[in-house]
């Protein structure tokens, strides 16, 4: 199912959406934070999807618990370290971990730049102990408005040499991309690549804006592109990568079930699309789960799965020499 000769990657993976249940429990008790359960077993349903619950509101509540326990920078560093460990344990050769420093900082008024530094330190510590390659993507969380995003941007750009890209995430309908044109001009001026969550809650116009104005060369989710033939042609012609997260799309009710997920439409059209986990801690999945469901629920062949795997490597924000090294390590 997973082709061992091709590097296994996960490019759309939120570091702040992957906090272990055990870690939430321990940090909550360590810092006197009231948790919604009296035992570790009882806590799991509050922070992880159980079974087939598909509700955006429920999903976001679970996500919020993951940052509610980040009471100090040591907690941030621990979560970053464990993200590297989890990536390695799930068999990934390469992952891009993205994080929103304001979202991680806001519950306990942590310094935004301090959060960025703690994430970098935790990832570096993790890389010393685990055989996986990691790059970092900074997120501006649009839901908190332009000013908070500017604070995030400044904290992230202070360490731009430790990042490969910047992302725009959050409430796509309430805070359209046009509000962040100036923010992304600074990102482009800093020489960072750009990805953006778009075409998930909003339509294809959100994707056009992200690509043509913000400068995105990859799009997170992008499920609504299939309703715009001109956009589909553009995606193929310009090799705009689509970071697909099927299980997450189900859990957030972006799609009703795997049968109607547009992954196959994208692949058949020749769009550069790959599989990702999104918030693996909340969805309670790993990358192998995504390949399994695409095969079992969506009927993809092993050849199609291998194409998705190759696409992921091609889309990665890395140099051609690093890409070749990833393949060489699989030989």
From Swiss-Prot:
Please state what the protein is called.
Answer: Adenosine deaminase
Described by its record, this protein's role is as follows: Catalyzes the hydrolytic deamination of adenosine and 2-deoxyadenosine.
Q: Which SUPFAM superfamilies match?
A: Metallo-dependent hydrolases
One GO cellular component term noted in the UniProt record for this chain: cytosol
Entry binding sites for Zn(2+)? 12, 14, 197, 278
Which E.C. number(s) belong to this protein?
3.5.4.4
Q: Which cofactor does it need?
A: Zn(2+)
In its UniProt entry, the species of origin is given as Shewanella denitrificans (strain OS217 / ATCC BAA-1090 / DSM 15013)
Cofactor note text: Binds 1 zinc ion per subunit.
List of catalytic residues: 200 (proton donor)
Q: Which InterPro entries match?
A: A_deaminase, A_deaminase_dom, Ado/ade_deaminase, Metal_Hydrolase
Q: State the family it belongs to.
A: Belongs to the metallo-dependent hydrolases superfamily. Adenosine and AMP deaminases family. Adenosine deaminase subfamily.
The EC category is: hydrolase
PANTHER family per the UniProt record, alphabetical? ADENOSINE DEAMINASE (PTHR11409:SF43)
**One GO molecular-function entry:** 2'-deoxyadenosine deaminase activity
Keywords of the record, alphabetical order, are: Hydrolase, Metal-binding, Nucleotide metabolism, Zinc
């Amino acid at each position: 199912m997973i082709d061992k000769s091709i590097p296994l990657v996960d490019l759309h993976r939120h570091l702040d959406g992957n906090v272990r249940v055990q870690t939430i429990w321990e940090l909550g008790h360590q810092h006197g934070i009231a948790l919604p359960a009296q035992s570790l077993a009882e806590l799991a349903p509050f922070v992880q999807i159980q079974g087939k619950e598909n509700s955006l509101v429920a999903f976001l509540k679970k996500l919020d618990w993951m940052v509610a326990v980040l009471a100090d920078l040591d907690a941030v560093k621990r979560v970053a370290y464990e993200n590297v460990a989890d990536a390695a344990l799930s068999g990934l050769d390469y992952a891009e971990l993205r994080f929103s420093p304001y979202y991680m900082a806001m519950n306990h008024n942590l310094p935004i730049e301090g959060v960025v530094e703690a994430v970098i330190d935790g990832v570096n510590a993790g890389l010393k102990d685990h055989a996986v390659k990691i790059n970092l993507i900074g997120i501006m969380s649009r839901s908190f408005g332009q000013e908070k995003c500017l604070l995030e941007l400044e904290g992230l750009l202070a360490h731009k040499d430790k990042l490969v890209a910047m992302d725009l995430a959050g409430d796509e309908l309430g805070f359209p991309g046009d509000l962040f044109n100036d923010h992304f001009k600074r990102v482009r001026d800093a020489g960072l690549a750009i990805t953006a969550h778009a075409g998930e809650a909003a339509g294809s116009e959100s994707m056009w804006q992200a690509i043509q104005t913000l400068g995105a060369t990859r799009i997170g989710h992008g499920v609504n592109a299939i309703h715009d033939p001109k956009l589909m042609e553009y995606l193929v012609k310009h090799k705009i990568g689509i970071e697909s997260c099927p299980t997450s799309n189900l859990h957030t009710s972006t799609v009703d079930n795997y049968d109607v997920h547009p992954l196959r439409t994208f692949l058949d059209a020749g769009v550069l699309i790959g599989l990702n986990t999104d918030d693996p801690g909340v969805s309670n999945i790993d990358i192998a789960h995504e390949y399994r469901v695409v095969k079992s629920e969506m009927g993809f062949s092993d050849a199609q799965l291998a194409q998705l795997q190759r696409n992921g490597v091609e889309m990665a924000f890395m140099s051609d020499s690093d890409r070749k090294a990833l393949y060489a390590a699989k030989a």
